[in-house]
C-alpha cells in the first residue's frame, strides 16, 4: 500500500498499539499469512539495513521517533535458536532482561531490548538507536504449522542526544516509548489558565490587631504567606508593657505569691491580673486580641509601671525563646514545689546563696538566643525587632528570693559503693554437715586429705564450694608410695620373664 501521510489525519492521531495488541493481533495475523490485514507495518529485514536508514522505509510517516517493522527470523545457526543481528556497520546487542507480555493473565509473548553498536564486539561504540523485539510464545504461533511463517515484530526508537530539563536522554526516550494510551498523549500547545485578578480581602476579624494576620496582600492582589515565626514579632515591642499569652503556667497559684512574702515592684501586695483568666480570655477569643488592647487588660489597682518582674517572662518573643524560657523556668517544678520549705519569719529560705549566678546564666543564654534570632530574621519588611532587656535582679540575700524555681539534686549510691559493701559483708562460714561428710569420706578412702568446706554468702544467695587442701608432706609421702609400688611391679614382671626363659631352655635341653 502507499504511504499514509499524517497530514490526512486529524491532529492528535497516533499509531501506538500496546504490547498485547502487537503480539495478539499484528503478529498473529502476519504469522498466519494474512499480510493484507497488517500492511500498515512493512516487512523489512532489519539486520540488512542500518538503523538510520529504516525510518525512511516506514509506511506511516510521522515525526515521532518510533517505527514498526516485521522481520523474518534469521537464524545464526541452522539448528540453533540464536538470531543473526549483525549489520555491515555494527551489531544489535541484547541488554537487560526479557519482559513478559500477558493477555488476561496468560503469557502470549516476550519483549527483548536491543541497542545498536558501531563496529565489532567487544570494542563496539554504543549509539542512540534502540529496538524492542516482540516474539510470540504460544504454541500455535511458533511458525511451524502449515501456512505459517516465523516472524518477529521490531519497534525502533531513536533517543535524543541532548538533555531535556536535566533528564537523561535514555529516560526521556523510554518514557516517550511507553505512552500507549490516548490519555498519555497531550497536545503541544498548552494554554495558560488566566488567573483571577480579584484581590483577596483580609477578614474583618483581624483588623485592630498587630500580628495575627496569616498573609499579606500586595498591590496586584497576590497573597503572600507570612512566615509563622514572624507572627510573634509583627508588632512594636517598645509600647508593649503587658504580657502576651504564653504557655500555661503549672503553678497552683496565679500571680500572687504573697503567702511567701513576695513584694511587687510598686511596693504593694495586691496581685496582678490572674494568669488563668488572661490565658482563657486570649485563647477563647484570639481574633479580638491585639497589642493595643493588652495594655488595657491590666488590673487598675496596679500602676502601669507596677507589673511585677515575674510577668516579664511572658513578653512577646519568638516561639523558640518562649519555649526555651518556659522550659528553663518550669522544669521539674512538681518535684521542686513539693520540696520547697520557707521559713515562718520574714519569708526566710534555706536555699544557698548561689541563686544570683543561676539567674545570670539564664540571662546570658537569653541574650545569646535573642542575638541568633536577630541574625536569622530578614530585614526590609517593616518589622521592627527589639532585643529583650535582661532582667536585673538585685541580690537581697536569703530573705526575699522570689519564686524562682530551684533544682534539687537527689544523690544515688553508685554501683561501686554497693559492690564494696557487699564485699565487706561477705563471710566465710563452715557448714558442720559438710565437714562431717568430708571427714567420713577421708576415713573410708584412707587418704590424709584435710577437708575444708567454705560457704560464701552474698545477699540471699549462698554458694557452697568444697575445697580439698593437702600439706606438702602428705603429697611427698603419697608420691613415694606410688613410686615404690611401680618398682615392685616392674621387678615382679622381670622375675617372671626370667623364670619363663629358664624353663624354656631346660625343656629344650631335656628333649634333645
UniProtKB/Swiss-Prot annotation:
Disruption phenotype: No visible phenotype under normal growth conditions. Mutant plants display enhanced resistance to the bacterial pathogen P.syringae pv. tomato DC3000. Residues 175-204 are annotated as: Disordered. Residues 108-165 bind DNA. InterPro entries: NAC-dom, NAC_dom_sf. GO terms for cellular component: endoplasmic reticulum membrane; nucleus; plasma membrane. Changing residue 491 to R: No effect on binding to calmodulin. GO terms for molecular function: calmodulin binding; DNA-binding transcription factor activity; transcription cis-regulatory region binding. GO terms for biological process: cellular response to osmotic stress; negative regulation of DNA-templated transcription; positive regulation of defense response to bacterium; regulation of defense response; regulation of DNA-templated transcription. The chain crosses the membrane at residues 489-511. It is a single-pass membrane protein. Expressed in roots, rosette leaves, cauline leaves, shoot apex, stems and flowers. Expressed in guard cells. PROSITE patterns: NAC (PS51005). Residues 9-159 form the NAC domain. Residues 175-196 have a biased composition (Polar residues). It is found in: Cell membrane; Endoplasmic reticulum membrane; Nucleus. Keywords: Activator, Calmodulin-binding, Cell membrane, DNA-binding, Endoplasmic reticulum, Membrane, Nucleus, Repressor, Stress response, Transcription, Transcription regulation, Transmembrane, Transmembrane helix. The NAC domain includes a DNA binding domain and a dimerization domain. Transcriptional activator activated by proteolytic cleavage through regulated intramembrane proteolysis (RIP). Calmodulin-regulated transcriptional repressor. Binds several synthetic promoters with randomly selected binding sites. Functions synergistically with SNI1 as negative regulator of pathogen-induced PR1 expression and basal resistance to a virulent strain of P.syringae. Binds directly to the promoter of the PR1 gene. Acts as a positive regulator of innate immunity. Involved in the effector-triggered immunity (ETI) induction of immunity-related gene expression. This is Protein NTM1-like 9. It comes from Arabidopsis thaliana. The gene is NTL9.
Amino acid at each position: 500500500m502507499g504511504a499514509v501521510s499524517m497530514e490526512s489525519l486529524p491532529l492528535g492521531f497516533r499509531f501506538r498499539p500496546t504490547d498485547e495488541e502487537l503480539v495478539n493481533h499484528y503478529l498473529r495475523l502476519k504469522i498466519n499469512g494474512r499480510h493484507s490485514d497488517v500492511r500498515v507495518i512493512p516487512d523489512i529485514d532489519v539486520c540488512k539495513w542500518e538503523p538510520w536508514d529504516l525510518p525512511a522505509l516506514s509506511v506511516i510517516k510521522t515525526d515521532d521517533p518510533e517505527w514498526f517493522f516485521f522481520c523474518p527470523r534469521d537464524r545464526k545457526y541452522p539448528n540453533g535458536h540464536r538470531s543473526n543481528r549483525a549489520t555491515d556497520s555494527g551489531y544489535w546487542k541484547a541488554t537487560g532482561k526479557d519482559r513478559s507480555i500477558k493477555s488476561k493473565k496468560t503469557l502470549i509473548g516476550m519483549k527483548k531490548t536491543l541497542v545498536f553498536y558501531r563496529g565489532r564486539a567487544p570494542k563496539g561504540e554504543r549509539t542512540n538507536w534502540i529496538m524492542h523485539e516482540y516474539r510470540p510464545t504460544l504454541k500455535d504461533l511458533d511458525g511451524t504449522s502449515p501456512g505459517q511463517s516465523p516472524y518477529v515484530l521490531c519497534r525502533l526508537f531513536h533517543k535524543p542526544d541532548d538533555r531535556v530539563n536535566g533528564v537523561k536522554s535514555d529516560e526521556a526516550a523510554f518514557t516517550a516509548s511507553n505512552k500507549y494510551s490516548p490519555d498519555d498523549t497531550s497536545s503541544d500547545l498548552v494554554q495558560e489558565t488566566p488567573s483571577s485578578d480579584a484581590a483577596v480581602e483580609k477578614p474583618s476579624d483581624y483588623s485592630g490587631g498587630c500580628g495575627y494576620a496569616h498573609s499579606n496582600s500586595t498591590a496586584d492582589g497576590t497573597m503572600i504567606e507570612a512566615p509563622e515565626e514572624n507572627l510573634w514579632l509583627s508588632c512594636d515591642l517598645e509600647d508593649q508593657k503587658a504580657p502576651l499569652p504564653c504557655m500555661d503556667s503549672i503553678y497552683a497559684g496565679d500571680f500572687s505569691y504573697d503567702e511567701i512574702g513576695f513584694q511587687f515592684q510598686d511596693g504593694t501586695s495586691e496581685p496582678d491580673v490572674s494568669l488563668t483568666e488572661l490565658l482563657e480570655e486570649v485563647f477563647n477569643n484570639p481574633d479580638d486580641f491585639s497589642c493595643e488592647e493588652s495594655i488595657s487588660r491590666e488590673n487598675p489597682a496596679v500602676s502601669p509601671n507596677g507589673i511585677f518582674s515575674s510577668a516579664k517572662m511572658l513578653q512577646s518573643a519568638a516561639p523558640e525563646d518562649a519555649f526555651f524560657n518556659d522550659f528553663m523556668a518550669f522544669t521539674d517544678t512538681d518535684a521542686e514545689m513539693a520540696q520547697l520549705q520557707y521559713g515562718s519569719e520574714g519569708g526566710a529560705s534555706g536555699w544557698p546563696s548561689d541563686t544570683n549566678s543561676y539567674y545570670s546564666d539564664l540571662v546570658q543564654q537569653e541574650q545569646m538566643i535573642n542575638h541568633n534570632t536577630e541574625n536569622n530574621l530578614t530585614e526590609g519588611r517593616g518589622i521592627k525587632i527589639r532585643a529583650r532587656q535582661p532582667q536585673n535582679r538585685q541580690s537581697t540575700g536569703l530573705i526575699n528570693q522570689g519564686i524562682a524555681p530551684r533544682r534539687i539534686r537527689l544523690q544515688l549510691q553508685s554501683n561501686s559503693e554497693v559492690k564494696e559493701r557487699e564485699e565487706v559483708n561477705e563471710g566465710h562460714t563452715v557448714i558442720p554437715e559438710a565437714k562431717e561428710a568430708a571427714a567420713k569420706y577421708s576415713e573410708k578412702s584412707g587418704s590424709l586429705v584435710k577437708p575444708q568446706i567454705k560457704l560464701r554468702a552474698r545477699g540471699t544467695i549462698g554458694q557452697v564450694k568444697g575445697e580439698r587442701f593437702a600439706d606438702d608432706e602428705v603429697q611427698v609421702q603419697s608420691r613415694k608410695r606410688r613410686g615404690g609400688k611401680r618398682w615392685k611391679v616392674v621387678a615382679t614382671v622381670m622375675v617372671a620373664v626370667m623364670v619363663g626363659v629358664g624353663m624354656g631352655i631346660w625343656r629344650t635341653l631335656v628333649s634333645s
